[in-house]
Amino acid sequence: MIEVLNLTKKIKKTTVLDNISYTFEKGTIYGLFGSNGSGKTMLLRALSGLIVPTEGSITIKGEQLHKDISFPKSVGLIIENMQLLPQYDAFTNLKILSKIKKIASDNDILDSISRVGLENFNSVKVSKFSLGMKQRLNIAQAIFEKPDILLLDEPTNAIDEKGVAFVHDILLQEKKRGATIIITSHHKEDIISLCDIALEMNHGRLETSEKVIYKKDS
């Protein structure tokens, strides 16, 4: 669970996150939609600990970010312009990350690669991957440690229809496992097709009126 209270982030004189308060529950898929510059990616960066709020707090599983912990534990993250290592193959990219985090076995890595449909490309250099394949590998990186929280910025961007089906299936499995999942998109329709709750970002504000929250029927 993630509890956000009066979260504000200012960059110079610009308010990029504006007094956001919301609780993201476990076992739920949340979708943030809104135009470019609305604050979607900035909110994910704040929730991941990559940026420090100007005001307010973020509490994850009882621990307050930047007070009790610097970075939340067990978070899978995809953000815009996330870098892969093009000189290495798919398996090695995840293996290097697992060594840095000191988590996950080779079997966990292979399973994650298979779940995103790249099992036949383990030994292929990432430099030869299409944009869609790179995005799927990013998703494999996000899920291979079985995180409690998934923060995914445009996870289906550049992915073909078959790849989108893979991603949706993966996220539904992660939801069943009890993960808190937050994804972003420019399109409300894309959010509604997958998410339990859709929330609109607008000029740094998280709109939570009934007009813009969609709750999927049980």
Swiss-Prot record:
InterPro entries: AAA+_ATPase, ABC_transporter-like_ATP-bd, ABC_transporter-like_CS, P-loop_NTPase. Coiled coil: none annotated. Keywords: ATP-binding, Nucleotide-binding, Transport. GO terms for molecular function: ATP binding; ATP hydrolysis activity. It comes from the Bacteria. ATP binds at residues 34-41. Residues 2-216 form the ABC transporter domain. Disulfide bonds: none annotated. Belongs to the ABC transporter superfamily. This is Uncharacterized ABC transporter ATP-binding protein YybJ. The lineage of its organism: Bacteria, Bacillati, Bacillota, Bacilli, Bacillales. The gene is yybJ.
